[in-house]
Amino acid sequence: MDNQEKKTNYQNTDKENDLEKNKEKKNDESIFQNKKMNEIREKIFKNKKEINNLKLRHLANIENIKKNTEKKIKKIKNAEIENFFKQIIPIINNLEDILTISTKLNLNDEPSIQGIELTLKSLLSILIKFGVKIEGKKNEIFNPKIHDVILTESSNTIEPNYIISVKKKGFIFKKTILRKAAVVISKT
């Protein structure tokens, strides 16, 4: 082989080597870019997941706020209703006292007394419609949670610890005792 051919061979080999190096370089760059793309995709996926978690937490917080607000509103509403009922009870007492006195004075047939009786019945039926339970009935067993004893009497017809008579009715609204019934019970 002559020099010229050797030179051409070297040049071709150099060109091939350069091409190989360029291919390797491009291949390395491609691998590097793929790694970078995968890292970016991973970050995007993590960010989306985190955003989704934040949204879910935010929605849960909103639900909790709604529930707590509803509970508070219900509690305030019940407290106001209880307060209203407590304001009505003295009026009921006054009407019952008038009817008791009218019975003693034998005035039950008077139109004004009959009007008072109807008013009292109307008030009591309204309370019942709104969920107020009226406590204290004759021949009912005494319960210290809902009854106050104002007197004890001996009785041949009523068993011990049973109510002989009710002096003032008791009122309960949703497990809240607005007023205990004032009762007379039989002695033990």
From Swiss-Prot:
Residues 1-29 have a biased composition (Basic and acidic residues). Keywords: Chaperone, Cytoplasm, Stress response. It comes from the Bacteria. Residues 1-33 are annotated as: Disordered. The keyword Cytoplasm applies. One of its GO terms (cellular component) is cytoplasm. Transmembrane segments: none annotated. InterPro entries: GrpE, GrpE_coiled_coil, GrpE_head. GO terms for biological process: protein folding. Gene3D superfamilies: 3.90.20.20, Head domain of nucleotide exchange factor GrpE. It holds the Pfam family GrpE. One of its GO terms (molecular function) is protein homodimerization activity. It is found in: Cytoplasm. Homodimer. Participates actively in the response to hyperosmotic and heat shock by preventing the aggregation of stress-denatured proteins, in association with DnaK and GrpE. It is the nucleotide exchange factor for DnaK and may function as a thermosensor. Unfolded proteins bind initially to DnaJ; upon interaction with the DnaJ-bound protein, DnaK hydrolyzes its bound ATP, resulting in the formation of a stable complex. GrpE releases ADP from DnaK; ATP binding to DnaK triggers the release of the substrate protein, thus completing the reaction cycle. Belongs to the GrpE family. This is Protein GrpE 2. It comes from Buchnera aphidicola subsp. Schizaphis graminum (strain Sg). The gene is grpE2.
